[in-house]
């Protein structure tokens, strides 16, 4: 680009002839770019001045000067906590090893002297025969049988502990040694636990207590098995009670005496069992449901029916009082009837001809038969 010569006062000295080789629009473009170049030059000079000023200030400031900013009085922080460093104390000298004290020797307690066990006695002495009773003591009759059965029942009830263990079992629990004994005269003894088959001769109805009999259906041999002590056909007499509890299915029968065909009589005092040896005799039980609850149910139904009919036949204003009075009366009658009949005991029926059993509860001595042909 060619500059035009100018005069000293800034004006053009003379007209510059345009160059015929440069087009007119190129001269116009250069004329428009000229202000931009001046602007860029001014910006570069300003930046250079700013940079030089910053370098001069950084060199003029002290090299290690610290700037401290003072906070306002309301925002000043409290002074920090001061710690004091104490010198380390010297470690104490180690203690010398001391021997351990020996354990004291305590005197040993002396063992207690052994206590000899108490002498054990057999519940039944088989070596000595039972003492004979005179004929007056062996009189038969309802009084003797009732007394024997009552004594047997009291003995069984009193001999049971609270936990259901019999008195004999409770006595034997504390015994540590059992000694065997030899029973003499086994040919004329029946041992406890002997089973006697019997056929019931009388019907049993437990509404009232009473007596019953049975006939021995099979010969019963002695403990040795050599002699028949209770022959077939022997009559056994016993007694039953009437206090059958609700829900019970068995009746207790106590057999008191044996009457042999030869005329010999012996006190038995043993309970009745069924064919399997279970205590008591089973039978047909009538729980009397109709007698216990029939009256109360009937009165309750009548009360409901009366209330229903009164509610239909009475007007709405007075029917409520009459209905409540009638219903309350019927309910009271039903409760009174139930209280009077709820405790009716059930009845057990045991037919005659049933096969039952007798379990001997104590040893029976038949030494009176010694020397006879029986």
Swiss-Prot record:
Main location, first listed in the record: membrane
Transmembrane regions listed in the UniProt entry: 38-56
InterPro entries (alphabetical): T4SS_VirB10/PtlG, T4SS_VirB10/TraB/TrbI, T4SS_VirB10/TrbI
Pfam families the record matches: TrbI (PF03743)
UniProt subcellular location: Cell membrane
Bilayer topology annotation: Single-pass membrane protein
Superkingdom: Bacteria
UniProt keywords, alphabetically: Cell membrane, Membrane, Transmembrane, Transmembrane helix
Family designation: Belongs to the TrbI/VirB10 family.
Protein name: Type IV secretion system protein PtlG homolog
Organism: Bordetella parapertussis (strain 12822 / ATCC BAA-587 / NCTC 13253)
Lineage: Bacteria, Pseudomonadati, Pseudomonadota, Betaproteobacteria, Burkholderiales
